[in-house]
């Protein structure tokens, strides 16, 4: 299901918002269950097979978090195992066939490609699984409540394309009593942000996508000017599609009294590559800085390690590309 589909806008979204606040009036945990159920419906709509790997991921990571929580002494090896499993599965789904293609080209072999179906949103929920496990190991979470965990990982506004939010921040908001009641200001702001994101997606991104699709279809007859326009249109398609989706996610969350971080800050106004990096997919940059760049030493270990750490973060951002 997509945010810009009629079924979501006219049925799933209003019903979820209504049931969420009604359920909170009965008992707070019921509101969380509404989010979990709505998220499962949203994710599995038309592709129920996607739930299999997501379910396996949930079992592995929540089980790992419980094991880590029960150990009184912090152990890096216990933490490393679920991280290795998460990253390994992510690389398997996204890059195995890419690796096979390069091996075949380099060695002149003909190893068969694997029939791999990429789970929707795997990059986003995998990285947030890592964030949850790390937060548990560092003692940032007071408890590892199963309902809170599921509501965090499955939260449908961010499940497929982000933005990424820290588990401590999200779970804290989810449990604040004042956020469980309808806030008309947040509702109005949420509708506004969602509408702007919808316009970005439907009127701008999809229009450029049509032009890009036509250009690729007729690429053999394309002139130099056509190719230049293709590059330009594609950059706008990517930005407005991703930015529009993120805006819609932020808008939906505002309706539910949850604050998600803004993900883009006019990146095409950047005056340098470094400035662009800071403006594009902001939540991912913060995640990679916190969980990769700083633990590796950041810029504290000399110029060579600074460049190496930056390169590792760059590849981390590349792995996240296309969800």
Task: Show the residue positions of the predicted features.
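Membrane-embedded transmembrane alpha-helical bundles that form the catalytic cores
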Residues: 1-323
